[in-house]
Structure formats: C-alpha cells, structure tokens
Amino acid sequence: MMAEDRRARVRALLDAVRAEGRTALTAPEGKVLADAYGIAVPGEELARDVDEAVACAARFGGPVVMKIVSPDILHKTDAGGVVVGVEGAADVRAAFCRIVANARAYDASARIEGVQVQELLPRGQEVIVGAVTDPTFGKVVAFGLGGVLVEVLKDVTFRLAPVDADEALSMLDSIRAAEVLRGVRGQAGVDRWAVAEQIRRVSELVADFPEIAEVDLNPVIATPEGAVAADIRVILAAGAPKERRRYTREEILTSMRRLMQPSSVAVIGASGEPGKIGNSVMRNLVDGGFAGEIHPVNPKADDILGRKAYKSVTDVPGEVDVAVFAIPARFVAAALEEVGRKRIPNAVLIPSGFAETGEQALQDEIVAVAERHGIRLLGPNIYGYYSTWQDLCATFCTPYDVKGGVALTSQSGGIGMAILGFARTTKTGVSAIVGLGNKSDLDEDDLLTWFGEDPHTECIAMHLEDLKDGRSFVEAARATVPKKPVVVLKAGRTAAGAKAAGSHTGALAGDDAVYDDILRQAGVIRAPGLNEMLEYARALPVLPTPKGDNVVIITGAGGSGVLLSDAVTDNGLSLMEIPPDLDRGFRAFIPPFGAAGNPVDITGGEPPTTYEATIRLGLEDPRIHALVLGYWHTIVTPPMVFAELTARVVAEFRERGVEKPVVASLAGDVEVEEACQYLFERGVVAYPYTTEKPVAVLGAKYRWARAAGLLGGGS
C-alpha cells in the first residue's frame, strides 16, 4: 500500500473513532491499522452471532482463538473475553455464548459488537512490541519479553520513535533475555529481522499519527519463520499536547554567546549593603576581575562598589548582554518589561518564589513578558552562573575562578554548591558552572548546544531532575557526543513508576526506564550518583581515548587483582587474553611465584623496577589498549615512588605518541592520597582505597568512545 493511501485509510478510521467519542480502538479496527502499516497479524474475522462464528472457524480449518469485541472493554482477558484453542462447531457455539455472557457480567453497559474469531498461531517465543507517548520524550517504541508475565519480568527496552532497521535490531540485543531470541538449549532462534520489522512499523505508525497515545502488540509470537502479533491494542490521546516554542541552533548559539561571553552586565537590585544578595552578586563580579562593564541598577543609590548606579536599566548607556536579577519575585515582571524595552537578550533570575513554591501564575507571567520581548530566561530560583574563561562570577555564592575544560550544570542550588566544593577540593578546572532552577525557559539542551561548540569545554556534566523537551536534548546530545563526553546524573530514579495505564507498554514505561534507554541511545554517559558524575567529569578529559578493547591489569596484590577483574567485567570492559609471547615477556620481570595471565600479579614485595618494567611492557605492546594498575603500599616501593615512576613512564610514552588510558587503584596508608593526586595531575586517573572507581571511570571513557564512533560496538 502506498504511503499516502495507508495514511488516508488510517486517518479516516481515527477520525471516525474520535467522532464516536472513543479513545480505544476495537480489535477489528486495530487490524485495519496493522494491515495499512504491514504489521503482521493472524487471519481473523468478526462474528456478530453464533452462526457467523461457526462459519468463520470453519473457514480457518483448525483451532481458533475467540475474543470479545467491545469498544468499552479494553482488557479482554480480565473480562473473561478470550478463549484459546476452540475447535469444532459445538465448542465454537459454547465459547461464543460464554464470552458474551462473561463480558456482560464484567460490564453490563458495555457495547458488544461481536466476537473476533482468529486463527490459532503456532507456539513460539512471546514478545511485546509497543509504543507510548512519554511526557518527556514524546513517541517512544518499546520491545521486550511478552505474554502474561510481561509486567512481572519487566524485561523491556525503549527507543525514540521512529526507529530505522538497525535501531530496531539493536533493541533485540538490549534486553536481559537477548540470548533466548538467538536460541538456547537446542531451540532455534527467532526470525530477528521479522521482529525488528514489527518494531519499525509500529514506530512509523505512531510517528505518523501523534494522536495515537499507546500501541500494544502483546503477545507477538516470534518463531524461526516470522513474527505475528496475536493481539493489537490502540489507545488515542484525550487531547493534543501543548507545543513548546522551539529555537533554531543559530538562535540558541547567538543568545548563549552573549550570556556566556558578555561585554556588559546589569545587576537589577544591586546593593552596597553586605549580606544582601544584590551586594554578593556585585562583589563577585567586581572582585572576580570581569573585564566587561558592570552596571548596578538601584533607584535608591548613586554609587555601588565604585560603579555608577542607575534608577532603571533603561538608563544604562549602550548595549547590555545580560541582566542579573536580585530582587523579590513580585517585582520581577515589571523589571523584566524594562529589560525588554532596553533590548537585553538574557535575564538571569536568581529570586525564588515562583513555581517551586506554588506560584505558577507568577512564573507564567514572566515567561509571557520574556517571550513578548525576545528575552531568554535563566532560572528563576538559581544561584547564578560562572563563566570562568570570562572571569565572570554572577552569583551570590562563593566565587570560583579555576579555569579548565569541565562544564557543570545543576537544576538544584544545593547540588550546585556540592559541585563547587568538589571542584575546589580536587582542583578541577571548569569552563562554566550554571544553575538552571525552575527552567522557565533556558534548559539543558540550550546549554548543551553551547558547550558542544565552546572550545574551552572538553566534558559536560549535568545534574537534572527532569527534561522539559527530551527530544531537543537528544538532538543536542547527538550533535555534541561525537566531539566531547556528556555525563548526566538523572535524579528521581526510584520515583513512583508508571501511572495507571491503558496498556502493558504504558505500565512498563516508568520514567527512569525510558530515560535510561534513551540517554544511552543518545550516547550520554549516565552517572549512578553525584560523586560519580563529578569524578567522570574531571577524569574523562584526563584520559586518552582508547584505540581498542584489550584491557590489562598489572597489580602488586592478588586480592586487588580479583576485585579489579570484577570491576572490569561490571563496567562492560574486556580483559585481554594474554598471548604466549606477551606472557613470556611479563614473566621475565616477575618472580616465579607471581602470575602472568591477566591480571599480571607481580606480588607485593617487588621493587620499583618491577613496576616500571611491567608498565613499560604494557605501554609498548600495541595489542594492549588500556592499563589498570593495582598498587599495594610497601616500604620497598613507597606510594610516591610508585606515583613518580608511573607518571614518568606514561609521560615518556605519550611524548613518543603512545597514548593509552592508564588508571590506578592505590591501597595503603594515608600517603597514597598524595600519590593519587600527583598521578591525576599528570594524566593517570588514580584513586586511593577503591578498586571500583578507577575502573568505572575507564568504563565511562570506553562508553563515550563507542558512542562517539571512535570504537566499534555502539554505546
């Protein structure tokens, strides 16, 4: 069927259903959609009475499945409206009567159109293919193990719809039971292409018709010969969602450039009185060394911190790039009108007292003012922002000026301050720290678009509680990930789960499950916690990009080697199978009671020369792509001796063009802390008292390299 013809056919059907005031399609109506989009379903007919049911069953010539058809009964099994394996005229008659009686008992007011008589499919692997409308990401397609246990097993994966054939196939390998589909215990695998086609076509259907809220094919019977949907359920949305205003990439970059690289900043509510937010913002801007113009705005002052104060922002001479608000929430809308008349493109709203306290109307008002004047809003309810390469500290919190390549954002002020403390403690250089707060306008996809192009930014780490527009974020992430890593800490992993849903797919699509799969699809590295997000952010720019999958562990302690091996496996990395010649090479440097293999156990009492020789061999051999070092504190090789020799050898090889990621776990007394800091500052990611953290960082680097297309195997 031609694309235009099938869309016209489906459009006519959906309009008719809407005209009747219904949101659920009947099974025969679902078959119309399936046929239009090439979704394989069994032969079936609608029987309006007993005699028609007998005739239908006779035409199929074998056992049949019989199902109630009612626009008012969504879950047919719950209503006793499904009978499987019916054969013979007498049984068909009895089943028809029983199904109708059960349906009337279930819902006496239900409209009953008849009974669907469907050919019985052969036994096979039951899977579910579906689609839901996610509040964050829009149309999302789902795949997993199906049948009656689908909501118990919850072995399901999600992708943004529509998907192409390759993405659909990748979903088959993304569930825990992936091997079942390939065939286990002598059973043949399923026709993977046929299953993937069901996924692709469902995704195409919901992308073409936004009013379709949910689609369920459950179960799909998958066999070596094909994949057929035994049941199809379609639910329509009650109303169209509100469209969010979208900005072009060029518009975002133009606005963000003036926000992050301003020449002139006005502080509305600036104060000369210590303890006031307006004073703290002014003090940070002035003391931070910002080279641009700083204009305090306060109708009651003539001079603030040596700067001329203005009664209104409209009195400020020349262009202004950013207006920072440090006034109570109730005065923001009026002041924002003046910002609009001044044609200032960006407003940074520090005040709280908006939607986060229930004052949604007040927030809606400032958004309307901003949209009318073309102002982009950062906030409200934020600590401000730092743009270190501009010496810009527009915040009422403690200043920070250590320049570097890490851009950090947070939706929460408390998390923002944790970011600041971590950066200071670890001496992490940052390109920016930005608070997002209520995200009335500017959000993560705007910042991601900017940081993706910012030459000062090498890694982006974002704390978020939600995304206003998941598709825009994914679009920005896909454009950024090939150039630099994006790390996300998504809060609310254990939030409530699925709301009441009309389909199995809807019940399975809990917020976090969808976030997890789609962030991975976008190439984003998801951090399990705040510390991991911060450690990934500071460590990923330090590590060179691996050129292959072979990881070798060199350790001075067997126990650490076992734990490091576990961590390698847990992080999806590959321990190299050591070939005989390399095994002989390592054995030449370690005592007879040591162990080559992988891990290479040099034992704890070895001198610095053994560490150096084995590390050199690991860096020299081109078959090895990454090193994990396990150090055990001994007087023979003190921590700083180990750190200095490791840093020296790694630097020597990098000067020769051999750049491999090297991470280290240091076990010992407190001296290992200084040794780790020394190594970190010299390009070896090292942590004391943990075997998990250095390998987790290496795993994150590998995930990014795959997502960026620098290694095979996907993300």
Task: Give the positions of each predicted feature.
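Catalytic-core regions of core metabolic enzymes
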Residues: 1-715
